[in-house]
């Protein structure tokens, strides 16, 4: 359960980094590696979110079918690899098309591979009478892990902020 919660917590957190770190991402995409003009930066981040949301909504339709046909362990592993490789690519700050593709891969990883398998694993952990407790425990563990990941992100961001309030993306 612990590994599944870590995976599902990160899976939910990473595609939505733009909500927590919007201003920092604007600096990176307009100053550090200018791939979009400052006038269109917010629109670009919205386009990334729209690509992710649209594809995820479509992939959820197939996630349950895929989870019933393949072993959960294999789906979680494939989703982890896809999300990990996409996140490494994201860290290199590719161009516009690359960032949109990364979010399409995130949508496939979360919607088809990870989320349905995670729900199936959680459901299998207890009897029908224990389902409420199993899902409550998994949500609690996911929330605690998301909080810790958020603190780690803020700590890393704190190291990148210079004393005058500006950013040093090289850190």
Where are these regions (language model features)?
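Central cavity-lining transmembrane alpha-helices of secondary-active solute carriers
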Residues: 47-65
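Hydrophobic core of transmembrane alpha-helices in multi-pass small-molecule transporters
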Residues: 86, 97-113
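Glycine-rich segments within core transmembrane alpha-helices of 12-TM secondary carriers
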Residues: 132-158
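C-terminal ends and interior cores of transmembrane alpha-helices
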Residues: 81-95
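Membrane-interface helix caps of multi-pass secondary transporters
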Residues: 17-39, 122
